[in-house]
Design a protein with these regions (language model features):
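Short, small-residue-biased leader/transition segments that mark boundaries at the very start
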Residues: 1-6
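Residues that form generic nucleotide/phosphate-binding pockets
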Residues: 9, 34, 66, 139, ...
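Mixed-charge, low-complexity segments
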Residues: 16-22, 26, 81, 88, ...
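A generic structural signal for short
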Residues: 19-20, 69-70, 120, 155
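Active-site neighborhood of thiol-dependent amide/isopeptide-bond enzymes
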Residues: 24, 37-39, 43-102, 106
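Hydrophobic/aromatic-rich core segments of domains that either
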Residues: 75-168
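Low-complexity, Gly/Ser/Thr/Pro-rich intrinsically disordered linker/tail segments
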Residues: 151-196
Length: 196
């Protein structure tokens, strides 16, 4: 199960204890890399990774389900990643916009800075779908698995941070189909994982 994934890794994680610049991002990338090595694929009802009509009635699968099937959608992926962040004492944020969900995290203890991630990019994706102008797929030739993992992590941040900025007003408006949920330790206690 998922426990083993980060029991092995968790000793390396310090949450916000390290004052080194970028320390939190490095830890988040380590999680990203672990999940990528487990060959996550992205699943969406409509088979397009950027579909605006992803239905939110999909049952959020339990983590072991998601890990075993390696099929993940934006809701599963965001909730899974948020739980992993919480487990290593980094404060996650779940963000919802109409038809989509992504995850964020505070890069420091005082919550002055945050980054966001497009978790669907953990899987086998065509980066050209996300960045049509950059022809990224051609830059991937000959890159190692770790180089690719880092590239998709950085691109995922770039993409989600942009989406956050574009939708910031809505996200904080409390309007239907928008959400900004900080998952503090207290919230985590209230959220019961959905059983099988």
């Amino acid at each position: 199960g998922l426990g083993d994934v980060y029991k092995r890794q968790v000793n390396r994680f310090l949450g916000y204890q390290s004052k080194a610049k970028g320390a939190v991002d490095k830890q988040v990338y380590a999680l990203w890399n672990i999940l990528q090595k487990r060959k996550f694929r992205y699943s969406s009802v409509s088979n397009t990774s950027l579909s605006s009509n992803v239905v939110f009635s999909q049952r959020v699968r339990t983590f072991d389900d998601a890990l075993e099937s390696s099929q993940i959608n934006c809701v599963d992926g965001s909730v899974l990643f948020a739980s992993l962040l919480r487990a290593i004492n980094i404060d996650p944020i779940l963000v919802r916009t109409p038809g989509h969900m992504f995850v964020g995290y505070y890069t420091d203890n005082s919550h002055t800075d945050k980054n966001f991630l497009e978790t669907t990019m953990i899987g086998d994706v065509d980066l050209d779908d996300f960045f049509p102008d950059e022809q990224l797929d051609s830059t991937m030739v000959g890159k190692s698995q770790n180089e690719m993992s880092l590239l998709t992590f950085e691109k995922s941040k770039q993409y989600a941070n942009k989406k956050y900025k574009e939708n910031e007003e809505g996200i904080h408006s409390g309007k239907l189909n928008y959400m900004f949920l900080e998952i503090s330790k207290d919230v985590r206690r209230k959220i019961q994982p959905i059983g099988k």
